[in-house]
Amino acid sequence: MLPLVCRTHEKPVAVSMKKMLLLVASVLLAVAVTAGCATLDAKQREWIFQPSNQSWGGAQSTSDMQDVWMDFDSQETGQSARLHGLWLAQPRADAPVLLYLHGARWNVSGSSARIRRMHALGFSVLAIDYRGFGQSSAGLPSEAMATEDAHAAWRWLAQQQPQAPRYIFGHSLGGAIAVNLASEVDDERGTMVEGTFTSMADLVGSFQWGWLPVSGLITQRFESVRKVARIGSPLLVVHGSNDSLVNARLGRQLYEAAQQPKRFVLVEGGSHHNTNAVGSPLYREAVASLFQLR
């Protein structure tokens, strides 16, 4: 039987995510054989992004954040698109600004606590929902669409804050989107990623059932390790030592593939979801020294 080659249009609990990835790995072959590449691609996009309008927090968690909207014409879908974002500004007009890119499953308001911690470091923060999440345009997200969404938000920041230095932050899956964006723009002052990975194939392969032969069937590849060397700004890679979803080894490998200046911070006791909180003092010191922000 000839190998199946799939081509795409493209260019929060850890346990449930692991179950999802196990489902991806165990079902990919069956879906590919019985339903073909289009269904395989769609199922992967559902499993990886888990798009939702659900959040960990309620309206109160974002009550002091401003709703903002970004409209653009999507080259990926050929349709008009609208992104919803949350804007948390600093009192200082010249404060650095940060584009916050969240991970899978929950909408942007589920990241409100992490948004506030980044704000406490001195950034004005724009956090967006990709299409398919929250109040952004409906649709099934993909790697290409999420990258396009990140670019749209980056342009919005440039238009709204033309004098401010701009930075990129991504958590988990958002870290892969952040690396992709940073590798394609040349006006970022720095990039931060937390709890992220080298590639989707490496992530699937890092689990105990990673021997399953599914790498060639992955359409949403998120190959950050191939892109990170193209980032021309300082890179901060943060990982929790107790991250049971994305092994810290993958974060270290991503860091090693990047150019200088860069820094790797391992937060002892940090999990996939609390590293940002547990490691707040380390974040503050690393941001100050690597990006020379006070």
Predicted feature locations:
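Membrane-embedded segments
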Residues: 77-156
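Alpha/beta-hydrolase fold nucleophile elbow
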Residues: 161-172
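Hydrolase active-site cap/lid region
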Residues: 175-233, 277, 281
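Acidic catalytic loop of the alpha/beta-hydrolase fold
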Residues: 242-246, 273-274
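Short alpha-helix in the alpha/beta-hydrolase fold that links the catalytic acid
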Residues: 114, 224, 233, 247-256
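An N-terminal hydrophobic leader/cap segment in hydrolases
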Residues: 32-74
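Short beta-strand/loop motif that positions the catalytic acidic residue
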Residues: 231-232, 237-239, 243
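Catalytic histidine neighborhood in serine/cysteine hydrolases
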Residues: 255-274
